[in-house]
Each structure stands twice: as structure tokens, then as C-alpha cells.
């Protein structure tokens, strides 16, 4: 199993500086990770640094809350793609979802996907804030949205992905939508387990430690 090819090497801290992005990129090149995942203001910078690499750039939008108006999400996605991102990780509108306004949530996702062309969209449903029935419903919405991935977590709630999250999500989406497990992965054994349960991508800021088979004490 080529673990590196499952990993989105992630740096989403608001205080991240150019030297931190440089370090992220150097690590991604060294381990040949599938992608880096960064905030949208760094996409153009990272694209220049990765111009001779096949490592993908994933940009988060309206992160970490997902509570902005749809037009703002659409505009940020368009700009991130124009700057060099080929993948977008968006947060669904959790408040609207909790209100039962599923049509709004669906249209919010569809509107972003509509301006992305063939680029990949991952939808973060923030499983830590949902019960089992809500996880199922959120996955069903993502299924109908045209997005390529459903993703567990932002890393900013009280926990990241759990094995039970992935089991519920996989049972709901089958092979129709891919799954990204993010946060909460503390060792290589846990990483492998998430993949075995059905995750096609892993989001973590501790990618290097995981590749070196170290135990993660803190971090996303």
C-alpha cells in the first residue's frame, strides 16, 4: 500500500507564513504526497513552487465554518482554481443543515461545483457535529450535488474523523462518491485502518510523522 498517495499534506493554520508553506511543499516533494491542502491566499505562491511537480494543490474555501453566502464561496472557488488549485475542499453550511434546509445546502454545493469544471470538489460535513442520521443525510446531499468527495472534518471542531464515521459514510455512498478522512489519525495503524474502511484520501498535518511510523501527540 503506497500510503503517501492517499495523503493531502495539510497546513491551514491562520498564522502560517511563506517559510511554513515552503516547508510543506518540500515535504510533499520528498514523500511524493498526492496533494497539499492550503488556504486560498497561498495557492498562487504554491503553484509557482510546484510548477515542475505533479503534486496537486487543494484549496479550502469558506474555511472552517462554511457559513458564508453561496456567492462568496463560488467566488473564492473560482479564484483558487484560476490561481492553480485543481481541488477544492468546501465546508457545507452546517447551520442551514441543522435547520433542515436541505435544499439550501444542496444548492450551495451545486453552485460551487458548477464553476469548477472538471476540478475535484470535496465537501466537509463536520461529522463531529452530526449524529448518525445526520451523517447519512449529509452524505445523501453530497451524493446528489455532483461533488467527487465527502470529507469528515475541518480539524477545528472537537474531534476529527472516527472509524465509525467512515463506516457510516461508506455504507451510505458506496462507490458513487469518494471519502476523505481528516483529523484524528494518530498513527500509521489508524491511517491504514481508515483506508481499509473506505477512505480514498487522508487529510493530515502530521503526514511526515505518519510516514515515519511515529505516534502523533498533537496536530491535525
Swiss-Prot record:
Subcellular location: Cytoplasm
Keywords: Cytoplasm, Lyase, Schiff base
Transmembrane feature ranges: none
Coiled coil (residue ranges): none
Positions annotated as active site in the UniProt record: 89 (proton donor/acceptor), 151 (schiff-base intermediate with acetaldehyde), 180 (proton donor/acceptor)
Pathway: Carbohydrate degradation; 2-deoxy-D-ribose 1-phosphate degradation; D-glyceraldehyde 3-phosphate and acetaldehyde from 2-deoxy-alpha-D-ribose 1-phosphate: step 2/2
EC number of the protein: 4.1.2.4
Reactions catalysed according to its record: 2-deoxy-D-ribose 5-phosphate = D-glyceraldehyde 3-phosphate + acetaldehyde
GO molecular function per UniProt: deoxyribose-phosphate aldolase activity
GO terms under cellular component: cytoplasm
Origin superkingdom: Bacteria
Primary localization: cytoplasm
GO terms classed as biological process: 2-deoxyribose 1-phosphate catabolic process; carbohydrate catabolic process; deoxyribonucleotide catabolic process
Gene3D superfamilies membership: Aldolase class I
Family named by the database record: Belongs to the DeoC/FbaB aldolase family. DeoC type 1 subfamily.
Function, in words: Catalyzes a reversible aldol reaction between acetaldehyde and D-glyceraldehyde 3-phosphate to generate 2-deoxy-D-ribose 5-phosphate.
Name of protein: Deoxyribose-phosphate aldolase
Designated gene of the protein: deoC
Amino acid at each position: 500500500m503506497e500510503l503517501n498517495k492517499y495523503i493531502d499534506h495539510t497546513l491551514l493554520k491562520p498564522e502560517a507564513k511563506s517559510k511554513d508553506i515552503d516547508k510543506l511543499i518540500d515535504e510533499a516533494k520528498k514523500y511524493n504526497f498526492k496533494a497539499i491542502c492550503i488556504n486560498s491566499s497561498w495557492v498562487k505562491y504554491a503553484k509557482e513552487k510546484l510548477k515542475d511537480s505533479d503534486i496537486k494543490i487543494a484549496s479550502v474555501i469558506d474555511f472552517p465554518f462554511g457559513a458564508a453566502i453561496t456567492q462568496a464561496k463560488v467566488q473564492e472557488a473560482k479564484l483558487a482554481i484560476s490561481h492553480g488549485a485543481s481541488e477544492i475542499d468546501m465546508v457545507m453550511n452546517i447551520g442551514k443543515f441543522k435547520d433542515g434546509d436541505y435544499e439550501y445546502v444542496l444548492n450551495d454545493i451545486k453552485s460551487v461545483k458548477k464553476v469548477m469544471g472538471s476540478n475535484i470538489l470535496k465537501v466537509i460535513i463536520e461529522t463531529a457535529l452530526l449524529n448518525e442520521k445526520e451523517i447519512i443525510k449529509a452524505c445523501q446531499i453530497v451524493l446528489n450535488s455532483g461533488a467527487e468527495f465527502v470529507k469528515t472534518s475541518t480539524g477545528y471542531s472537537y474531534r476529527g474523523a472516527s472509524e465509525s464515521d467512515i463506516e457510516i459514510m461508506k455504507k451510505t455512498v458506496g462507490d458513487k462518491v469518494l471519502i476523505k478522512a481528516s483529523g484524528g489519525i494518530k498513527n500509521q495503524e489508524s491511517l491504514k485502518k481508515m483506508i481499509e474502511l473506505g477512505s480514498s484520501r487522508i487529510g493530515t498535518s502530521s503526514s511526515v510523522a505518519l510516514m515515519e511510523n511515529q505516534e502523533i501527540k498533537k496536530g491535525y
